[in-house]
């Protein structure tokens, strides 16, 4: 067993858990504390020295935050010898992508998506206070801490691509964001700010619900095309100012057209670049509103007498889609800020409480958020908003009547305990939560069964009666799953996740917009800074059905290295055993593989550590 030593500590290397393009990650035992840690090991040379310099600078800035309260990974120390660099981090369990893959990419209920979103928004709000743009937010960079002890408690990792806003705003060609989660201002070459992270988070939220990336573009043209087909064309003034607009758009030949720009056709793009556009979406949405109709979300609208639990879940899903729409806007100044998003009814659960407080769904949602924010059984410290953000931006609905300025009661209780009758019983059943409670039957063995389960909504109440469907349905464009189906699984390339050589990122050359003065609104949006635009506020929507598919889609790959030929970067949808759920008991546990908790041992780390190792 090898041993490495810093100036202040000594580490015993237990095993190497992952190797990447620029280094490896090992699980080590820290002698001074007796804790297991993750050690990223890189070669000590001039090239890697330049790469690691930025990450170290950002890690030291973030080190001033409380990593548990700010939901960022704990950085322990950095040291080096003549041959290697060493970065030591706390040991986390697995990232959201690996969690999805373990669970066959089944859709995550809205209440769990809220729990994750709340924590990531808190992290982004803290990073904004330090003027830091994470610039690579995606499921791989959101880590579950310990799913057995703290369900859906997460932390943001990987600051190798992060930037300090004041330093990057005038840089000619910074590298930021992975393609699936890349903001429009980065795609088009427009001024950008920290709201690029908000766009990425909106894409992650949609992906957790869909079980598939919302915009899985094979290249930047496909990425822009997918966004346009769902959200409409960007406003003309954006394209007039965009440095890269001519890559994806052309002038409209019709002088009377409302928009002087039009998206280049697939044939135009093929003729110009010799690259054939691909169709890799699972759902071809004609608007973001259609997100709520996917995976059984539209079942309630087709039932005459849905029960109150189904109504509560449907209302929550609808509220989540409203927040996603505020996050995914073409114009960054119209996009919701992290602090304002923390006041959104979906995150605060205000509407859910007012209309569905007596439901088990609400109580479980509240309990899940509460547990994710507590550390060692203690409530989180108060979050005080800056003057420009208006009122305190974090407050769950249950706190409204008892919370002070910081969102904590005077007695120190984080939530009121005088709960409605039966609530405690519901809380006690948290361990019995299932990721597919409202979507049983997703564990089909065949592709046809999986597609059928996703298309046929669950019968919510046995006494319900179906009524004719209302409203358009999204087009199911990809039949199969990320793990099974007719497409051959391919091995993921080394370092294909988030390499710190920025190989999966892009260049752009723009200045950042000046900060706009706050424009006070009302309700939960009070305090969100906005700017006004002389252009119409409504983004034109594409009409008609989605484009016909000429090529069968390939498995939706994670964004691969941009500096290489895309055809040489295979996808990562690898086969895994059937997924296991935490805490399933009774008859629902029958037929599911056994899960081995680890209350007395180190959590699973392979996925996270391989990712960290692949970063360099």
UniProtKB/Swiss-Prot annotation:
Biased composition regions of type Polar residues, renumbered to the chain: 497-512
Catalytic activity, EC: 2.7.11.1
Active-site residues from the entry: 136
GO molecular function: ATP binding; histone kinase activity; protein kinase activity; protein serine kinase activity; protein serine/threonine kinase activity
UniProt keyword list: ATP-binding, Cytoplasm, Kinase, Nucleotide-binding, Phosphoprotein, Serine/threonine-protein kinase, Transferase
Domain of life: Eukaryota
Protein kinase domain residues: 11-347
InterPro entries given in the database record: Kinase-like_dom_sf, Prot_kinase_dom, Protein_kinase_ATP_BS, Ser/Thr_kinase_AS, Ser_Thr_dual-spec_kinase
Keyword Nucleotide-binding in annotation: yes
Catalyses which reaction(s): L-seryl-[protein] + ATP = O-phospho-L-seryl-[protein] + ADP + H(+); L-threonyl-[protein] + ATP = O-phospho-L-threonyl-[protein] + ADP + H(+)
Disulfide pairings: none
Composition-biased stretches (Basic and acidic residues): 542-560
PROSITE patterns, A to Z: PROTEIN_KINASE_ATP (PS00107), PROTEIN_KINASE_DOM (PS50011), PROTEIN_KINASE_ST (PS00108)
4Fe-4S among keywords: no
Alphabetical list of Pfam families matching this protein: Pkinase (PF00069)
Protein name in UniProt: Homeodomain-interacting protein kinase 4
Organism this protein belongs to: Mus musculus
Source species taxonomy: Eukaryota, Metazoa, Chordata, Craniata, Vertebrata
Gene this chain is encoded by: Hipk4
């Amino acid at each position: 067993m090898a041993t490495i030593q810093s100036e202040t500590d000594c580490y015993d290397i237990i095993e190497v858990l992952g190797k990447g393009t620029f280094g490896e990650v090992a699980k080590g035992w820290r002698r001074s504390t007796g804790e297991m840690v993750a050690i990223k090991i890189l070669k000590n040379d001039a090239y890697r020295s330049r790469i690691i310099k930025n990450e170290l600078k950002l890690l030291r800035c973030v080190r001033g935050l409380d990593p548990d309260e700010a939901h960022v990974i704990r950085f322990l120390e950095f040291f080096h010898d003549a041959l290697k660099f060493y970065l030591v981090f706390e040991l986390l369990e697995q990232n959201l992508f690996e969690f999805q893959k373990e669970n066959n990419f089944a859709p995550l209920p809205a209440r769990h998506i809220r729990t994750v979103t709340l924590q990531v928004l808190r992290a982004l709000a803290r990073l904004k206070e330090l003027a830091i743009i994470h610039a690579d937010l995606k499921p791989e960079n959101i880590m579950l801490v310990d799913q057995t002890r703290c369900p859906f408690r997460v932390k943001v990792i990987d600051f190798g691509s992060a930037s300090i806003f004041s330093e990057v705003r005038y840089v000619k060609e910074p590298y930021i964001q992975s393609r699936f989660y890349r903001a429009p201002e980065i795609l088009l070459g427009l001024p950008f700010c920290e709201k690029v992270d908000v766009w990425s988070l909106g894409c992650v939220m949609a992906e957790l619900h869909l079980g598939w990336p919302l915009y899985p573009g094979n290249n930047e043209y496909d990425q822009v095309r997918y966004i346009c087909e769902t959200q409409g064309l960007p406003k003309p003034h954006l394209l007039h100012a965009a440095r890269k607009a001519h890559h994806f758009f052309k002038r409209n030949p019709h002088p009377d057209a409302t928009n002087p720009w039009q998206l280049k056709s697939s044939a135009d793009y093929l003729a110009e670049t010799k690259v054939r556009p691909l169709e890799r979406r699972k759902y071809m949405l004609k608007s973001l509103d259609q997100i709520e109709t996917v995976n059984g979300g539209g079942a309630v609208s087709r039932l005459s007498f849905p029960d109150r639990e189904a109504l509560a879940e449907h209302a929550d899903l609808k509220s989540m889609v409203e927040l996603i729409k505020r996050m995914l806007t073409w114009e960054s100044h119209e996009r919701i800020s992290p602090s304002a998003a923390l006041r959104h009814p979906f995150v605060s659960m205000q509407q859910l409480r007012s209309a569905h407080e007596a439901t088990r769904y609400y109580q479980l949602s509240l309990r899940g958020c509460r547990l994710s924010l507590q550390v060692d059984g203690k409530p989180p410290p108060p979050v005080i908003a800056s003057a420009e953000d208006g009122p305190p931006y974090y407050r769950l609905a249950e706190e409204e009547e008892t919370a002070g300025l910081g969102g904590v009661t005077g007695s120190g209780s984080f939530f009121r305990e005088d709960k409605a009758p039966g609530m405690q019983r519901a809380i006690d059943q948290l361990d019995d939560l299932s990721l597919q409670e409202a979507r049983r039957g997703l564990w089909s063995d065949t592709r046809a069964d999986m597609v059928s389960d996703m298309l046929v909504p669950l019968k919510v109440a046995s006494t319900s009666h179906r009524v004719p469907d209302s409203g358009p349905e999204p087009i199911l464009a990809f039949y199969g799953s990320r793990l099974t189906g007719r497409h051959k699984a391919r091995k993921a390339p080394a370092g294909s996740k988030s390499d710190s050589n920025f190989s999966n990122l892009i260049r752009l050359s723009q200045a950042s917009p000046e900060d706009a003065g706050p424009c006070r609104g009302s309700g939960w949006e009070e305090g969100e800074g906005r700017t006004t635009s002389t252009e119409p506020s409504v983004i034109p929507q594409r009409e008609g059905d989605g484009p016909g598919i000429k090529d069968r889609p390939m498995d939706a790959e994670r964004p691969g290295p941009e500096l290489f030929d895309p055809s040489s970067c295979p996808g990562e949808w690898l086969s895994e055993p059937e997924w296991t759920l935490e805490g399933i008991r009774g008859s629902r546990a029958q037929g599911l593989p056994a899960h081995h908790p680890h209350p007395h041992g180190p959590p699973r780390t392979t996925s996270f550590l391989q990712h960290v190792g692949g970063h360099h």
